[in-house]
Amino acid sequence: YFNAAIKIDPRDYRAHHNMGNLFVEINDYQKALQSFTNAFDCDNNFLDSKKRMGEVYQWMYQENYDQTNLKKSEECFLEILEKKPDDVSSLTLLALVKLWEGDIDESESLLQKVHKHQYENQENLNKNIARILSNKKLLATLIKHEYEQLTHIDNDIDEIRNPKFTKEYYDKLKKYAERIKNNSLEGNDISIDFMKNILKPLYNKAPKNIKKNLINTKIDISNIESKYNQIQPEIVVIDDFLTDEALRDIQKYCRNANIFKYPYEFGYVGAFLTKGMSNKFFLKLSEDMRLTYGNIFKKHKLTQAWIFKYDNQKIGTKVHADQASINVNFWIAPNDSNLDSESGGLVIWNKLPPKNWKFSDYNSVSAASKINEFLESENVDKITIPHKENRCVIFNSKLFHKTDDFSFKNSYIHRRINVTLLFD
């Protein structure tokens, strides 16, 4: 069809672009590049094709680690940003390129621009507000965490100075939190101005102690690497994963960083690489992991990261698989938060998604029932790894997995928290 369109009009840039997307689907990157190049040559204001070229060069780099492809990817995104400086996806992808090149400072700068866009760009802000106000569960989850966190900060337990919130704002939060308890809060009770305030980070001071390795090297790393590489499927559990100092720093950061603005229906809130975690601490942490466990990560690089903070009266993340080669999942809640030391961690099944499944078939809340039926019908083995403070699980990210059932103390400082980083 697209070939026919191109024969009729060789300058049909959309036909060239769509042809490129078809080649991407079958992993024919050279032909995809040619099609996207043709599209851009037909109309050099059609930046989508230049962006796709940058993405394809990234994928080619991840296949063969040829630095030339990484450099070409960088050139594509820089060209786009010259014409469209606030293009979020180009800023994000360029930030990954800079991280993969080892330039943490520039990667941080780019990611912070993206994060700022999340709460300052009016169109993006309006979409997020509409999404939350239209879903009572999301609204309750966001307000409950915000109120608990600001109460914690206001009590000055962690000596956080100059919090940027007023008594009026805090009193409104308190009133809404009380209404959540009796299930009487509705989306139309909340003003747009209040939502703009709640979605703006009030405090986000990252840990500064990053000169030393953040990963504990006083354990048998070579033995851990051997276990990971010898076991099928690839799963290894590491206790005492972070250094003591790094653990305390990240615990304090997660208690106080006002970045958890992405609520989920089941009661947990999230922050992501481009949405709050855009700082040198996490970028350095990802590099320290990769370099310390070189025989696990090999040449794989960070592609995404998030932190989830759970409501201890609700459930965790449902069964899914992630689109990456390696998943790093570690837990930072203190051991005395967990009321059942044999649970609360991670369940992993020895099964990858069928090759004909789309991403949404294995990575969406709505797909959980289908996945469970599939795993039961196949009688797939699973392992359960209990929660423990400073315990890390590294595994093949494409394996189906979910949060184990958990029973934690019901207070803010005892919330179950997991940090996830994906490498590809």
Regions from the language model: what does each represent?
Residues 13-14, 47-48, 88-89:
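Helix-start (N-cap) detector for alpha-helical repeat units in TPR-like alpha-solenoids
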Residues 100-102, 107-108, 112-392, 398-424:
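Fe(II)/2-oxoglutarate oxygenase catalytic core
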